[in-house]
Amino acid sequence: MSLAEINKNEVDIVIGALNADLTQFLTSWRPFFSGFHLIVVKDPELKEELNIPEGFDVDVYSKTDMEKVVGASNSTMFSGYSCRYFGYLVSKKKYIVSIDDDCVPAKDPKGFLVDAVTQHVINLENPATPLFFNTLYDPYCEGADFVRGYPFSLRSGVPCAASCGLWLNLADLDAPTQALKTEKRNTAYVDAVMTVPAKAMLPISGINIAFNRELVGPALVPALRLAGEGKVRWETLEDVWCGMCLKHISDHLGYGVKTGLPYVWRNERGDAVESLRKKWEGMKLMEKSVPFFDSLKLPETALKVEDCVIELAKAVKEQLGSDDPAFTQAADAMVKWVQLWNSVNSSA
């Protein structure tokens, strides 16, 4: 699939703006964002006016806009990096591509800039293969195919719900690892896309992700978070939890999730030691979350994404709520998210 074959009217690019001056960011992405509709969501705590260069088809949402859409009491859900979720909420397009404002286009091993938007759409348009692992990675990629022994009955694949891209430079590490390995950088460009196997868990990150909003939009849920989380961080509990919810719901509904290409280049940001001081509680919560998701089975009656999120929230409150109040708050946030999703989209 080439850029000429992509229906740009089906794609929204969502950018959570934590920096007021987006000139350098958008200029670097102009060759790949041109012609697409952009949703820029301003961090509600950012006081400065946004600086956006001309030549983009863009809608900007501020704290005032959030309050008009979801109410003042609910706008607190969208602080810091969580502001990107507001973009997911108000979009009306089939596909969402989310890229953080501290990222620029990466270069492939040949020195060419990577068109992350096109690669994400290619990943989403082609089926996923979560039920039988293809050792040649994505069999739908150019130059690849199904390996020896791959069942013909499974070669049609399943719909792809999400494309989880990667990034170079600032490595995708948690705070303890980054604090110990302060000079560690990701320089490995792996030219591959693969489907995450069914029943396997993974974190996601809005730093570089795309998803089919029509298939799984409500599953991208801002829920489990720590006090003060959402600004500059290595380990963001909300992203990790969201990924586990998205993957479990995708497995339940028969969808697939891909990871690998495209890469972006992530600039330096944050302090790992400071992040560790704030977020070590989150690591303990994750140790409780993994066995929960491992044993969780959603009811067969949950046929819609919204139903799955509600059932998941119910299980979280019943099975994890007594362990930590953060889980109870997460369950309540998941229910609230579905209510907001239904309200905003029913009024469209």
Curated annotation (Swiss-Prot):
Motif residue range(s): DXD motif: 100-102
Reported cofactor(s): Mn(2+); Mg(2+)
Primary location class: cytoplasm
Compartment(s): Cytoplasm, Cytosol; Golgi apparatus
Domain notes: The conserved DXD motif is involved in enzyme activity.
Swiss-Prot/TrEMBL catalytic activity: UDP-beta-L-arabinofuranose = UDP-beta-L-arabinopyranose
One Gene Ontology biological process: cell wall organization
Record text on subunit structure and interactions: Heteromers with RGP1 and RGP2.
Family statement: Belongs to the RGP family.
Alphabetic keyword roster: Cell wall biogenesis/degradation, Cytoplasm, Glycoprotein, Golgi apparatus, Isomerase
Cited function: Probable UDP-L-arabinose mutase involved in the biosynthesis of cell wall non-cellulosic polysaccharides.
Record's GO cellular component terms: cytosol; Golgi apparatus; plasmodesma; plastid
Known EC number: 5.4.99.30
Tissues in which the UniProt entry reports expression: Widely expressed at low levels.
Entry annotated with the keyword Acetylation: no
Glycosylated residues, chain numbering: R148
GO molecular function, one term: intramolecular transferase activity
Name listed for the protein in its UniProt record: Probable UDP-arabinopyranose mutase 5
Positions bearing the site annotation: Required for activity: R148, R155
Enzyme class: isomerase
Gene: RGP5
PTM field: Reversibly glycosylated in vitro by UDP-glucose, UDP-xylose and UDP-galactose, but not UDP-mannose.
